[in-house]
Amino acid sequence: GKPMLILEHDAMFISKKPIPFDDILDSGFEIIGINEPFGATRLSQVFHENVQKEHFCKNDVVRAPLIDDIKVPQGIAGNSAYIITPKGAYTMIKLTKEHGAWPNDALMCRQLIFGLGVTKTYYTKIQRIKSTTTL
């Protein structure tokens, strides 16, 4: 298997710089979010601040931040633009078999996936269009 860039219908590129895939993949994370958090996740300012101040960084990637009570699932901003490795895909399949079919942001959380990271540089943002999971 090969790593994949996943872009949902509402992802839009904002960076003119190419995504440094090799560097991001060398960070060791299974799934890496590339979305800016503003408008994509609750407590987006806290998310952004925690990502930017995190010192345990490898190749511009940090662990997905904790922004709320540990009982609340927390992961990558928006879940609409991310890089997933074969190990990350296997983990998601395993979690789906274990917990059932849920939207990806319910399973793709730091409480269930230790190797969930985000880039400090944001390459995409969400477009403000109608969701396909909350019709």
Q: Positions of the model-derived regions?
A:
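An acidic/histidine-cluster motif and surrounding catalytic segment
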Residues: G1-L7, A11-L135
